[in-house]
Regions:
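Phosphate-binding site recognition
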Residues: 1-330, 334
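A cross-kingdom feature that marks ATP-driven nucleic-acid transaction machinery
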Residues: 301-467
Length: 467
């Protein structure tokens, strides 16, 4: 399915700026599947002389043969024997370009290196001895983020110090995702974002002339739809035991977020389960989270699902596939999705509100310039009860502490008072604290009056999220 080029203007501008420097470039582009890496590169290359090769999951010999054919086709050569090595292939391009600016893209680069571990060293040698003196623009692109970060960008990689630029390409945040959802109300935009996430190809499945319910039924509850089997197809492409990985994602989607809870739920050894979890993190499918201010090794570590479409699918589709495939899609909507969706949207809304603050922070439009943002959870020493803070953003001892409510009623003063108490549980030694209240349905008169008296209270409703 062809992906339209929407957004990514900054990323495209950055690539074109590097291209304009007219010297050797080694650019590394990575990010999980479907975020639009290939679409960005196609857009970048469309007005430039370029050789674009997408590696395949075959052996080194076959990849080299197909790469050779791509190169010979670019130079209008025929009846030539394939290159005997990658060094010969790259040297041929280097010699033929003769000062001409050419872009060489190798997509799915990890497929090549897994079959030929010496390839990275071959690249290193060529860069150091010839390529760096020319103006070839090389892009190495990959979806396995752990591999790209360690084997290509890492300090022990033969290519360490040779790259001239890199980009970790992520899914769109809610703000950029709205470019695909312009025909909907503010509430429906966020509800659709909660199901389709920020992946461009998934957002393109939304029909602008249909409502939220119809879009969910047509895209997730119809067995012929593009998204109906998408998560399973992606897992089969990336891992050898998709069933176990799928069980882990489902467990997290059902609320089992600690490592021991996940291993118990799926019936796997804890150590083995952690290996699977690490792989899913490296693929960008799940993420690791610790309370704000605590080390990554914290015993309070939990896991979440990065891609909202995966989160929706494993919560509502995976466990209901038998019903869906026997024609009960309307019943699945009425009994399983619609009654639970407001609860599901609570976590989605928190993510949206965090994105909102991050964008405002980057523009310098907040009372502080925070250096980190996250959630916090811990124990109230007075009551011995668990306390959770939806958002904490901080810089030194200045904090913005937020509460996010996706409810049908207006947020009242009790929520503000409770948030102040939570802030004290988190830390009593704060220099300055701002309280940010996010509400789907607005605020009571008492909350609005309090915010007018106290500049440390910031109110954000749905309209403000879209300004």
């Amino acid at each position: 399915m062809e992906e339209k080029f929407v957004g990514r203007e900054k990323e495209l501008a950055d690539l074109n700026e590097l291209y304009a420097q007219d010297r050797f470039q080694l650019f590394v582009l990575y990010g999980r599947r479907r975020v639009g890496k290939t679409t960005l590169l196609n857009e970048f290359c469309k007005d430039k002389k370029s050789i674009f090769y997408s590696a395949e999951q075959s052996n080194d010999k076959l990849n080299l043969e197909k790469f050779s054919a791509q190169v010979f086709g670019f130079y209008n050569e025929s009846n030539l024997e394939p290159f005997s090595s990658w060094t010969n292939a790259l040297s041929y391009i280097d010699e033929r370009q003769a000062g001409e600016r050419i872009v060489l893209v190798i997509d799915e680069f990890p497929y090549l290196v897994r079959k030929n571990r010496a390839l990275l060293s071959e690249f290193q040698h060529l860069i150091d001895h010839s390529l760096k003196n020319g103006n070839l623009f090389i892009v190495l692109c990959g979806s396995y983020m752990g591999f790209m970060e360690k084997e290509v960008l890492g300090s022990k990689s033969p290519l360490f110090g040779r790259r001239t630029g890199q980009l970790h390409m992520k899914s769109f945040d809610y703000h950029d995702s709205m470019k695909f959802l312009e025909n909907f109300s503010a509430e429906d935009k966020l509800k659709l974002y909660g199901a389709f996430g920020g992946t461009p190809l998934y957002l393109q499945q939304v029909a602008p002339n249909k409502g939220f319910e119809e879009n969910i039924k047509d895209n997730f509850l119809k067995i012929t739809s593009y998204l109906y089997e998408e998560p399973l197809l992606l897992l089969r492409q990336e891992v050898q035991e998709p069933g176990v990985y799928s069980a882990i994602i489902e467990a997290i989607a059902r609320g089992y977020t600690k490592a021991n809870e996940i291993s118990t739920k799926i019936g796997e050894d804890a150590a083995k389960c952690l290996k699977y979890i690490k792989t899913l993190c490296e693929l960008g499918i799940i993420y690791k989270e610790t309370p704000f201010g605590e080390k990554e090794t914290s015993r309070k570590t939990i896991y979440g699902i990065s891609d909202l479409m995966f989160r929706f699918w494993y919560r509502y589709v995976f466990t209901n596939r038998t019903l869906i495939e026997t024609g009960a899609r309307d019943a699945v909507w009425l009994k399983r999705i619609e009654p639970d969706y407001a609860n599901y949207m609570g976590t989605v809304f928190e993510r949206v509100c965090k994105d909102y603050l991050s964008v405002k922070n980057a523009k310098g439009e907040l009372p502080i310039l925070f250096t980190s943002i996250g959630r916090w959870w811990g124990t109230d020493p007075a009551t011995k009860s668990q306390v959770e803070i939806d958002i904490i953003a901080g810089d030194s001892d200045d904090y913005m502490i937020g509460e996010c409510k996706w409810r049908g009623e207006k947020l009242d003063i009790s929520v503000l008072n409770d948030l102040r108490h939570k802030a004290d549980v988190f830390s009593k030694t704060r220099d300055h604290t701002w309280y940010v209240l996010f509400s789907k349905s607005g605020f009571t008169d008492a909350v609005i009056a309090e915010s007018k008296k106290d500049d440390s209270i910031i109110l954000v409703d749905l309209d403000a999220l879209f300004k």
